[in-house]
From Swiss-Prot:
Topology within the bilayer: Peripheral membrane protein
SMART domains: AAA (SM00382)
Species name: Lobularia maritima (Sweet alyssum)
Pfam families assigned to the protein according to its UniProt record, in alphabetical order: ATP-synt_ab (PF00006), ATP-synt_ab_N (PF02874), ATP-synt_VA_C (PF22919)
Name this protein carries in UniProt: ATP synthase subunit beta, chloroplastic
Tree of life domain: Eukaryota
Length: 498
């Protein structure tokens, strides 16, 4: 991994004298820059425009070289607004791709695409930066062992387990608990795996980014008193920013995650919200550069751009990056090129259901719609696989019977079906779980449930061991022993009321 020492001002001034160009044309966020013969910058080099606008205010715009046009000209995309720029202004070739701060000092902080802190907490205290453009790890460096990434969340670990170093798609509308699930995963990876997380907000609403930051502070995922104890670094490139920034902010977040994996040898969780906006920004940039559009108006380089990001998210022999990517599906069309290209890279899908959220079952992960390539007997073992399949079959049968129950009532069902419904309702409630990050809202302590405990609990419910217990005993508990203890308490309470 190439790490650059932080550039100091004297070096910049030497570089300014060395390679200086001038703006020849500006069309929105696209700049054409002329350089002296033999001094052309490389593709992806950072260019910096410094000067003053007509009102005398300072301008500092960073761009990235995208095309070499010939006649000693390059075409670059601006990473911030180009207001105030004019033809003839000096442009400095930085000689390297964009580089961003990396390491422990980034935890608890919010950055923009350039790696500049935007949280008003002063400069970042780090002496190391790293370029955002890198090759994916060589095949010989990869860790090819298939291992499960335990999250401590029952429904995920049992029915749609995550792969260590894998990629997971998170599907869900507004208000079904996506943010809380993300924060719980960040909390659990820090506690159980000693890992850290990086959150990349790609082209989403500024308000949502702010809400996430405030909730993270409230739930102590970000520790305001001691930032070094925080568990996450945040990188935002929101909806109002130019397409260049939205296209590169995912790479900025990934670069920070790679440092934790390769240098600190940690397990890292990388969140990208939303991967569709990354594709959308690439499509805008492609159109601005004058490329011929491909299917449905997307960029012709869609698969290449997606692959160059996704192939860097992997497990190596040093550590792993497990990525959870929120996927927006335009017009609910799964055949749209953007989600279709994303699906090719995913190992698991976690689908959040509005129906479960309405019932108050959190996390509202749909046990029948969520899938994982890891749920195979040779990977997870026979016991885990059989238990998961039986749970799914029971829930599927309950789903099929719901219409009959709604019309005729439970009494019209056969004895066997009534037993299936009773167990399915217990399973449905046992798939809920109190979260650590929700303690401040619910008042009940969070629970981390190991995989072995999860399997044991569901096996006991399926075997009929707890057919006599009330279903509310299984709601919002950790392992199965807590459910039996809760049942005893409920029984004592009902006796006292009598």
């Amino acid at each position: 991994m190439r790490i650059n020492p932080t550039t100091s001002d004297p070096q910049v001034s030497i570089r300014e004298k060395k390679n200086l160009g001038r703006i020849a044309q500006i069309i929105g966020p696209v700049l054409d820059v002329a350089f002296p013969p033999g001094k052309m910058p490389n593709i992806y080099n950072a260019l910096v425009v410094k000067g003053r606008d007509t009102l005398g205010q300072e301008i500092n715009v960073t761009c990235e070289v995208q095309q070499l046009l010939g006649n000693n000209r390059v075409r670059a995309i601006a990473m911030s607004a180009t207001e105030g720029l004019k033809r003839g202004m000096d442009v400095i070739d930085m000689g390297n791709p964009l580089s961003v701060p990396v390491g422990g000092a980034t935890l608890g902080r919010i950055f923009n695409v350039l790696g500049e802190p935007v949280d008003n907490l002063g400069p970042v205290d780090t002496g190391t930066t790293s370029p955002i453009h890198k090759s994916a790890p060589a095949f010989i460096q990869l860790d090819t062992k298939l291992s499960i990434f335990e999250t401590g969340i029952k429904v995920v670990d049992l029915l749609a387990p995550y792969r260590r170093g894998g990629k997971i798609g998170l599907f869900g509308g507004a208000g079904v608990g996506k943010t809380v699930l993300i924060m719980e995963l960040i909390n659990n990876i820090a506690k159980a795996h000693g890992g850290v997380s990086v959150f990349g907000g790609v082209g989403e609403r500024t308000r949502e980014g702010n809400d996430l930051y405030m909730e993270m502070k409230e739930s102590k995922v970000i520790n305001e008193e001691n930032l070094a104890e925080s568990k996450v670094a945040l990188v935002y490139g929101q909806m109002n920013e130019p397409p260049g920034a939205r296209m590169r902010v995912g790479l900025t977040a990934l670069t920070m995650a790679e440092y934790f994996r390769d240098v600190n040898k940690q397990d890292v969780l990388l969140f990208i919200d939303n991967i569709f906006r990354f594709v959308q920004a690439g499509s805008e940039v492609s159109a601005l550069l004058g490329r011929m559009p491909s299917a449905v108006g997307y960029q012709p380089t869609l698969s290449t751009e997606m692959g160059s990001l996704q192939e860097r998210i992997t497990s190596t022999k040093k550590g792993s990056i497990t990525s959870i990517q929120a996927v927006y599906v335009p017009a609910d069309d799964l055949t749209d090129p953007a989600p279709a290209t994303t699906f090719a890279h995913l190992d698991a899908t976690t689908v959040l259901s509005r129906g479960l959220a309405a019932k108050g079952i959190y996390p509202a992960v749909d046990p029948l719609d969520s899938t994982s390539t890891m749920l195979q007997p040779r990977i997870v073992g026979e016991e885990h696989y059989e238990t998961a399949q039986q749970v799914k079959q029971t829930l599927q049968r309950y789903k099929e019977l719901q219409d009959i129950i709604a019309i005729l009532g439970l009494d019209e069902l056969s004895e066997e079906d009534r037993l299936t419904v009773a167990r399915a309702r217990k399973i449905e409630r046992f798939l809920s779980q109190p979260f650590f990050v929700a303690e401040v809202f619910t008042g009940s302590p969070g629970k981390y449930v190991g995989l072995a405990e999860t399997i044991r609990g569901f096996k006991l419910i399926l075997s009929g061991e707890f057919d006599s217990l009330p279903e509310q005993a299984f709601y919002l508990v950790g392992n199965i022993d807590e459910a039996t203890a809760k049942a005893t308490n409920l029984e004592m309470e009902s006796k006292l009321k009598k």
